[in-house]
Structures are given as C-alpha cells and as structure tokens.
C-alpha cells in the first residue's frame, strides 16, 4: 500500500499555514513627472492640438473640476508626446509606441514599489516564494512578472502569476489570490505588485465619445507592492499590518457593458456607461451582507473603509446608499485627490494611507482605531471584489 488516509491528511495539514494571511509590508511608487488637475485641461488640449474644440474643452474643464483630484503622476511627458503625435490623436495607430513604453516602464515602476515593501518587511528577498504581478497596461511575453523577478534578483524557482488587463477591480483580486497562496502553502511569502501606466490609454479628445474623455480626466500612473504571508515570524521582526479574513468576487446583475476596454491598434479603448455609480451603490449592500454575516456585523459605520476610487460619483452614491459618515471614505478620497485613479494600484495605496494616518493620529489600531474593515474593488464586468480585513493594534 502506497500510503494511508491518515498520512495524506498529515501531509495536507503540514503543507498549510495555521493562521490567516496578513499584509506584512507595503510600498508605493509614482513617476516623478506630475500634472496639476487645475492646469491639465489647458495642457491636454494644447498637446493634442485640440484647442479649436472650445466647447469640448469647457466640458473637460468641468469634468476635471468635479473629479476632486488635485494632482496626478504620469510617465508621459510633453517632450515624449511631441515626438509621438499619433498618441495625441483620438484614434491613430500607435500601439507599437505605447507598447515600447509599458513593456519597460511597468516592471521598473513595480520594482520601485517592491524594493520599498521588501525594505519595510526586513527579511532577505530569498524568502519570497511567490510573485503575483498585475497590470492593465500592455501585454508581453515573458511577462512583467518575469522582468520584475530579474530586476529584483529573486530566485529563479520563485512561483509567478501574471495578470494582464483585468482593470480597476484587480487590486482586490491580487489580495484574494495572495491570501489563498499564503494560507495554503506553509511558510509562503508572496510579493504582490500592481503597476499601472496610462501610456496605453492616453489619446486626444472626441466630441462623440465623452466616456473616453472621462478616463482622460481621471486615470494616472502608480505602482504598489505588498508582502503577504501567514504565521508571521515574530522573532525575525515580522508583524502584520492588516489580516485578511475572507475574500469574494461577483459579477453585478444587469451590468453587461457598463465598463469595458479593448486592445486595438490605437492602444486600449475604454467605455464607461453613466449608470456605473448607480449599479455599484444599488448592489453594494448585498456584498456587505454576505461578507459580514458570519461576523454578525451589520453597522457599516463600524467598519474602516477602503474602496477603489473610480470617481467621486461612485463614492458619493455608496455613502448615500449605506448612510456612511463622511470620514469613512477619508483615506479613499485622499488617495483620489493626491494621485488620481491608478486602476488596480489604488486600493493598495489606500491601505498604506490608512495605516500611516492611524499611526500619526495615535489611534488603537491600523484601521483608524476600528477592528474590522472592508476593501472593495470595482471594474470591468461589472466585477466587484470584496475583502474583509482585520486590523492590528498599533
């Protein structure tokens, strides 16, 4: 007989961690180049040779004013755009130029964030067992996960997973995957990286496609990295910042075509329907009920909140629907204001902002003094990721 049921059970148990997955370190990075939102309409219409479209420019100014964004970081500089006029047209073939940027710059920006996370973690990088890399910016083989592994000098046997073109919900997806990897592989330390560069979506204005213009007013560049692991080695200085208790993904009903993107010769084209905020706010309580019923929690103001800041209208509608106090979305709105919509990286930036503000304010936990929290990712599908978080004492 090759083996017994008891020995298989013992092997299975030995392979799995004892405790929940925790976020052990966070690092973020942005390109040095940044634009002030108040000045962006003038810059955008000038660089795209669209200043004759005066009515559309006024409309774009109003979009930027309503965005609640103060500044955004962007890899694309004025000099580069002048050298690549096809990227400034509304629908000119330009995929090669865009790909040449993101194939190099997405892993590089991801490395910047990863180096910071590894430094905070304080352990040798040889302890990293898994890499999960996510970007909506471009596609390549071997992927950005491979490039990052080389840039950081990780072990060639590190187990890699590459996620391309998932969109804004994917910050929640990488946490869900990292949780499963950490809890089902004893001793696993998962490096999670989300790196986004808008070079694939930047284009000039069109008065017949205003949804494209909305993206030009919101999207920005940034990368965030986490180290995720279960059973922290306290003797080595490991300590969780947040613990992940559960994670779920769902497709919202009647939401086909609400958000979608397509890779074309002109780059990635995005389409957003006006009822996206309504669709999310209408369905969010069901996701909350399912996530928090096992914990007996139904007071949404008792939670700390990390929500993907798709735009102020989504946050406003969610607040109104759930009766949330204004301070619940403080960390989310701060990241939207200072960085814009960085797609998948946003929720990881918000985690970082929340733990830093909690430390600065001297509250009891990393979750603004509260014990339980929720992280939401929203994106194409319309897909929603829901992660239940547990804070730790500061």
Curated annotation (Swiss-Prot):
The residue stretches assigned to a coiled coil in this entry are none
Matching entries from CDD domains are given as:
CHS_like (cd00831)
SUPFAM superfamilies named in the record = Thiolase-like
Q: Where is the active site?
A: 168
Q: Is DNA damage given among the entry's keywords?
A: no
| Gene Ontology biological process terms, A to Z | flavonoid biosynthetic process; polyketide biosynthetic process
Identify the EC number(s). 2.3.1.74
Q: Which UniProt keywords apply?
A: Acyltransferase, Flavonoid biosynthesis, Transferase
Q: Which reaction does it catalyse?
A: (E)-4-coumaroyl-CoA + 3 malonyl-CoA + 3 H(+) = 2',4,4',6'-tetrahydroxychalcone + 3 CO2 + 4 CoA
In its UniProt record, a GO molecular function of this protein is: naringenin-chalcone synthase activity
Superkingdom of the organism of origin = Eukaryota
Q: State a single Pfam family of this protein.
A: Chal_sti_synt_N
Q: In which pathway does it act?
A: Secondary metabolite biosynthesis; flavonoid biosynthesis
InterPro entries, alphabetized: Chalcone/stilbene_synt_C (IPR012328), Chalcone/stilbene_synt_N (IPR001099), Chalcone/stilbene_synthase_AS (IPR018088), Polyketide_synthase_type-III (IPR011141), Thiolase-like (IPR016039)
Question: Which PANTHER family does the record cross-reference, listed alphabetically?
Answer: CHALCONE SYNTHASE, HYDROXYMETHYLGLUTARYL-COA SYNTHASE
**Role, per record:** The primary product of this enzyme is 4,2',4',6'-tetrahydroxychalcone (also termed naringenin-chalcone or chalcone) which can under specific conditions spontaneously isomerize into naringenin.
Q: Which family does it belong to?
A: Belongs to the thiolase-like superfamily. Chalcone/stilbene synthases family.
Q: What is this protein called?
A: Chalcone synthase
Q: Which organism is it from?
A: Raphanus sativus (Radish)
């Amino acid at each position: 007989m090759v083996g017994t049921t008891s020995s298989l059970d013992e092997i299975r148990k030995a392979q799995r961690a004892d405790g929940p997955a925790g976020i052990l370190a966070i690092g973020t990075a942005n390109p040095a180049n940044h634009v002030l939102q108040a000045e962006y309409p003038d810059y955008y219409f000038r660089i795209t040779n669209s200043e004759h479209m005066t009515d559309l420019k006024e409309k774009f100014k109003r979009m930027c004013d309503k965005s609640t964004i103060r500044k955004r970081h962007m890899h694309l500089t004025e000099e580069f755009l002048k050298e690549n006029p096809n990227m400034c047209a509304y629908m000119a073939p330009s995929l090669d130029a865009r790909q040449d940027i993101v194939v190099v710059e997405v892993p590089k920006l991801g490395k910047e964030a990863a180096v910071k996370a590894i430094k905070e973690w304080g352990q040798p990088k040889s302890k990293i067992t898994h890499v999960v890399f996510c970007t909506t910016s471009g596609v390549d083989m071997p992927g950005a996960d491979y490039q990052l592994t080389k840039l950081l000098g990780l072990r060639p046997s590190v187990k890699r997973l590459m996620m391309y073109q998932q969109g804004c919900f994917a910050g929640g997806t990488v946490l869900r995957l990292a949780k499963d990897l950490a809890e089902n592989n004893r001793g696993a330390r998962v490096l999670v990286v989300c790196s986004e560069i808008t070079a694939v979506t930047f284009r000039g204005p069109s008065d017949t496609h205003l949804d494209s213009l909305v993206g030009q007013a919101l999207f920005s560049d940034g990368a965030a990295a986490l180290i995720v692991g279960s059973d922290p080695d306290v003797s080595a200085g490991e300590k969780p910042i947040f613990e992940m208790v559960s994670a779920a993904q769902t497709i919202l009903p009647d939401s086909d075509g609400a958000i979608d993107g397509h890779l074309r010769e002109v780059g990635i084209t995005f389409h957003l329907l006006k009822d996206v905020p309504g669709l999310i706010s209408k369905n969010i309580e069901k996701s909350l009920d399912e996530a928090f019923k096992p914990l007996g929690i139904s007071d949404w103001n008792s939670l700390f909140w990390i929500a993907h800041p798709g735009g102020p209208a989504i946050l406003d509608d969610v607040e109104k629907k759930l009766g949330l106090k204004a301070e619940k979305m403080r960390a989310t709105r701060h990241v939207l204001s200072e960085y814009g919509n960085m797609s998948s990286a946003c929720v990881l930036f918000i985690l970082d902002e929340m733990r830093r503000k909690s430390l600065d304010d001297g509250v009891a936990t990393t979750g603004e003094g509260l014990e339980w929290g929720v992280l939401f990712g929203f994106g194409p599908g319309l897909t929603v990721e829901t992660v239940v978080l547990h804070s730790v004492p500061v």
